[in-house]
From Swiss-Prot:
The keyword Cell membrane does not apply. CDD domains: Ribosomal_L29_HIP. One of its GO terms (biological process) is translation. PANTHER family: 60S RIBOSOMAL PROTEIN L35/50S RIBOSOMAL PROTEIN L29, LARGE RIBOSOMAL SUBUNIT PROTEIN UL29C. Keywords: Ribonucleoprotein, Ribosomal protein. It comes from Deinococcus deserti (strain DSM 17065 / CIP 109153 / LMG 22923 / VCD115). This is Large ribosomal subunit protein uL29. Gene3D superfamilies: 1.10.287.310. InterPro entries: Ribosomal_protein_uL29, Ribosomal_uL29, Ribosomal_uL29_sf.
């Protein structure tokens, strides 16, 4: 998901998106530990998306407080 698409999300959808990505990340880490990870680049991609979602959510909260 692109950051421009992330900015279009509603406030309640942010946590759902973050939770789903963290769950997938946990599953991929488990696969990596077992030695059968098919897409190792996906771990980095998910970590980046979670960070972007958290950053955008923080920006929106800061904008609401002003």
């Amino acid at each position: 998901m692109k950051p421009s698409d992330m900015r279009q999300l509603k406030a309640e959808d942010f946590q759902k998106e973050i939770d789903s990505r963290k769950k997938e990340l946990m599953e991929l880490r488990f696969q990596a530990a077992m030695g059968n990870l098919a897409q190792p680049h996906r771990v980095t991609q998910l970590r980046r998306e979670v960070a972007q979602l958290n950053t955008i959510r923080g920006e929106q909260r800061a904008g609401e407080q002003k």
